[in-house]
Amino acid sequence: MDKAEYQSRLEELNSLVKKEDYEGALAVVEAVDWRRVKSLRTLGMVADVYEANKRYPEAKKILLMAYDRSSIGKGILYRLVEVSVKMKDFDEAIDFYNEFEAVARHDNSRYLLKYKILRGQKAPLEEQISLLEEYKEREFTERWAYELANLYSKAGETQKCIDACDELILWFSEGKYVTKAMDLKMKYERCHRPSRSNTSIVLTTKRMKSHPRIRKHLKCG
């Protein structure tokens, strides 16, 4: 394949990925020999296409190629952990996690990676909850706050689930995970108890304001 043909294929691939037509993009991906490509962005996109089509071994192969071309590769290592978990290759997932931790010792996302490994291994809920609680102490984000609330629900910790939903709803106000939190909270309030009192909500707000990231945000405001 000459340079002009490769460029044409790459433009087609970019267009298909932008439209989220991953099935069509797969046909383009399989028509190109990616071993000569040096662009980490392009290799990452190719891995995205394979992953979207559940072709995890191929995605992993491309990510390893990208890792070989990268000076640090923190983001690539993160994805290698995720893909290895999806392949249920937990030994390799742990190896990649250890490499990630070595180059990103202070990156809070290491808690999420470890959680994803435990979740894939179907580890006890208490272990999964503990990791997400550690992450929440450092980062308060919608997706993982809801994930933690859902784990509390699965573990039968009803009050903790409701409190976690309240924090998420009060802080973020709207969005996909706020809606999910409202639905999860309502399930318990309909079945087990009346609505939370204003006093409970005030206490939840006070706990939120004590969170380091939220406190910093409030000071900046």
Name each model feature, range by range.
Residues 12-15, 49, 83, 117-119, ...:
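Residue-level signature for tetratricopeptide repeat
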Residues 44-51, 64-65, 75-140:
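Alpha-helical adaptor scaffolds
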Residues 11, 45, 79, 113, ...:
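"A position-specific structural signal for the A-helix of alpha-solenoid helical repeats
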Residues 69, 102-105, 156-177, 182-193, ...:
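TPR/TPR-like (Sel1-like) alpha-helical repeat modules
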